[in-house]
A protein has these predicted regions:
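C-terminal substrate-recognition "lid" of short-chain dehydrogenase/reductases
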Residues: 109-112, 120, 204-233, 238
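Short, small/polar-rich loop/turn modules that mediate ligand/substrate recognition or access, typified
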Residues: 164-171, 226-228
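Residue(s) in the substrate-gating loop at a strand-loop-helix junction
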Residues: 132
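Active-site helix of classical SDR
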Residues: 112, 148, 156
Length: 239
């Protein structure tokens, strides 16, 4: 349907990205999931997907062109895809620095660079990028991850100012998750999980749905007067 709102979500194959897609589907969007892996968790007619390496500019341009050709619009962009390659600074390999910066920061730049003109032509849109409390407050052993997520916040604040210069109602915000239960955290020792839960005032790890709820709010008209902000969803871990 031409009037159906379209949301593009990266890192859509599993975890937080899948939860975001499911929530936006429930909210009535047609969701386009992007991932380097196949998106196979649903056969909904309101979900379409593309396998794409978002670190390659040509591939990003091609997939955005395909989305616009099919749907004629992009109302929401959720930059969610991300990786970690943790190590203390003396032990961090250059390739681990590069790969995290490429996926977590460069890919956000490349995709937003291609989607923003679509939203500018429409005169409206919402861009939500997943940052992290590591991007706002840092963490031992995550120099690369912290730099990438801090960079996402800085870019988003700049874009919040840039994209509205000619009157377009394009909002740009970030969500900064705290300690979230995902496939990535399942391998952590129980002692580590208990330590993080004890440091969190609400006394538990967050869920992928907690993040999806925040993204859905920022994607919706309920947040129509919110832009350039970082929504921390961390159970009070960082106060």
């Amino acid at each position: 349907m031409k009037d159906e709102k379209v949301a593009v979500v990266t890192g859509a194959a599993r975890g937080i990205g899948q939860a975001i897609c499911e929530q936006l589907l429930e909210d009535g969007f047609h969701v386009v999931g992007l991932d380097i892996s196949p998106v196979e968790w649903s056969q909904s007619p309101n979900l379409s997907s593309y396998q794409v390496n978002l670190c390659e500019a040509a591939a990003v341009s091609e997939v955005v062109d395909s989305i616009v050709a099919k749907h004629q619009r992009i109302d929401v962009l959720v930059n969610n895809a991300g990786i970690t390659r943790d190590a203390l600074l003396p032990d961090m390999l250059e390739q681990d620095w590069d790969s995290v910066i490429d996926v977590n920061l460069k890919a956000v730049f490349l995709l937003t660079q291609r989607v923003a003109p679509v939203m500018l032509e429409q005169g409206a849109g919402s861009i939500v990028s997943i940052s992290s409390i590591v991007g706002t407050d840092g963490n031992i052993g995550q120099s690369n991850y912290g730099a990438s997520k801090g960079g996402v916040i800085a870019m988003s604040k700049g874009w919040a100012k840039e994209f509205v210069r000619k009157g377009a109602q394009i909002r740009v915000n970030c969500v900064a998750p705290g300690f979230i239960a995902t496939d990535m955290t399942k391998s952590l020792p129980e002692k580590v999980i208990q330590m993080m839960e004890s440091k969190t005032p609400l006394g538990r790890m967050g869920s992928a749905q907690d993040i999806a709820n925040g993204v859905a709010f920022l994607a919706s008209d309920k947040s129509a007067f919110i832009t350039g902000q970082v929504l921390k969803i961390d159970g009070g871990l960082v106060l």
